[in-house]
Amino acid sequence: MTKATDIRTKSADELNEQLLQLKKEQFNLRFQRASGQLENTARVREVRRDIARIKTILGERTRSAQPAS
């Protein structure tokens, strides 16, 4: 599990790369769960929440970069 403070120190490029890796892992976990091969079911939840954390921080950055109108 990645902490929000660790995510905030990374650049946008690093976050997008990590987001892509997490989405690939989520895809693989989904198939493992469907075929009954998934051993660590808690990892599905961790990955989903890590994706949400990264998307939230990226959204905060884009909103703060835009001037208020």
UniProtKB/Swiss-Prot annotation:
Q: Which family does it belong to?
A: Belongs to the universal ribosomal protein uL29 family.
* Taxonomic path: Bacteria, Pseudomonadati, Pseudomonadota, Alphaproteobacteria, Rhodospirillales
What molecular function terms (GO) are annotated for this protein?
Answer: structural constituent of ribosome
- Give one GO biological process term: translation
**By its UniProt entry, which HAMAP family does this protein fall under?**
Ribosomal_uL29 (MF_00374)
Kindly give the InterPro entries that the UniProt entry links to this protein: Ribosomal_protein_uL29, Ribosomal_uL29, Ribosomal_uL29_CS, Ribosomal_uL29_sf
Keyword list (alphabetical) reads: Ribonucleoprotein, Ribosomal protein
Matching entries from NCBIfam families are given as: L29 (TIGR00012)
**A GO CC term?**
cytosolic large ribosomal subunit
Q: What is the gene name?
A: rpmC
**By what name is this protein known?**
Large ribosomal subunit protein uL29
